[in-house]
Amino acid sequence: MAELPVAPFERILKKAGAERVSRAAAEYLAEAVEEIALEIAKEAVELAKHAKRKTVKVEDIKLALKK
């Protein structure tokens, strides 16, 4: 189960045009987004380490998103 709250994903699905959203669908979307975010975060951490920094900066996230 995802660590992120499910309610925001229900709102995202409704904003995308869904009239009704099952809890399972919102949970699945939350899990998928969490997996993708974790991969981006891992890449950003590696970029920060490569730059000899302990702090992940917005540039690291932007570069990680491009990969």
From Swiss-Prot:
Signal peptide boundaries: none
Keyword entries, A-Z: Chromosome, Cytoplasm, DNA-binding
Main location: cytoplasm
Protein name: Probable archaeal histone 1
Gene Ontology terms for molecular function: DNA binding; protein heterodimerization activity
Complex formation: Homodimer or heterodimer with another histone. Dimers then assemble into higher oligomers, with the DNA wrapped around the protein core.
InterPro entries, alphabetized: Archaeal_histone_HMF (IPR050947), CBFA_NFYB_domain (IPR003958), Histone-fold (IPR009072), HmfB-like (IPR050004), TAF_TATA-bd_Histone-like_dom (IPR004823)
GO cellular component: chromosome; cytoplasm
Biological function: Binds and compact DNA (95 to 150 base pairs) to form nucleosome-like structures that contain positive DNA supercoils. Increases the resistance of DNA to thermal denaturation (in vitro).
Similarity section: Belongs to the archaeal histone HMF family.
Annotated region described as Interaction with DNA, given as residue ranges: 20-22, 54-57
Entries under SMART domains matching the protein: TAF
Site (Interaction with DNA): 14
Places the protein is found: Cytoplasm; Chromosome
Coiled-coil blocks: none
